[in-house]
Amino acid sequence: MQTTETQIMPNRFSFIRKRLRQKVIANLLMLLVLIPVGFLIAMPFMWMLTASLKVRGHMAEGPMLFPATFDFSNYVTAWQGAPFGRYYINTIIVAFGIVVSRLLIGSMAAYAFAILKFKGRDFLFMAYMTTMMIPFYAIVIPLYLIIRDFSWFNTYQALIVPRMVDAFGILLLRQAFIAVPKDYIDAARIDGCTHWQILWKQIIPLSLPTILTVSIFNFMFAWNDFMWPFLVANDTHMRVIQTGLQAFSGRYLTEWTYWMAGTVMTTIPPIVLFLFAQKKFISGLSRTGMKA
């Protein structure tokens, strides 16, 4: 018996050492791939940040991680060269309106497609999902004519109302709602909860990671949107951050340091938002596995 145990223990230890060695090698290989890829992804932003800190007229210098001299006055000049404060306020208002409306409407639609039972539900859902294949450019002229007929040019309504519904967000929310255990829903019905109460007191709290993921997607969309705001709200007092940056770049076309400083100011908020919410963002995506 003792001889058998002494034979098993070395074999077990050698197996563990072998598995640990394989794991270390796999992690090293992964790092060897991820570090260069991460550097390539971050390089454009690093170049933009470096260019924004260079002294005016030194843009022709070769690329470097840090400039020889830091010139933070480029940011002051860029901020004073255009009403970026107003652009930020407009963009935040528009982004808030789009995010809230898409969450409110999307949650109700996703609840209907995931929880309610009615004839033709799956067909309606698939028909609605096909709208994701229609490019925005195919409907931009009808939308533009509607905004003109309503006299909504250079208003928040023109920037928010056409963007209040999002099929992709409804898809993510529906998948999250389907994953909620039916026992919770049945218990809420036994307690006499209405559909509205079930949605807001049971489904939404259990789907917060997905709610946050959809919110981040919608915020990024609103923050980066250029074409539609450029068409319907191009007055100085109604410009959002992207159209404001375009107007600023037209004014300082040859001043690359100022242009890069303005670009950095427009990219910082989404980056900061994602850094703080990335764990919830990834968790929300992992929870929305495609379930029938």
Language-model features and meaning:
Residues 8, 18, 26-292:
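A structural signal for multi-pass alpha-helical bundles of membrane permease subunits
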Residues 1-21:
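Short, Lys/Arg-rich, polar N-terminal cytosolic tail immediately upstream
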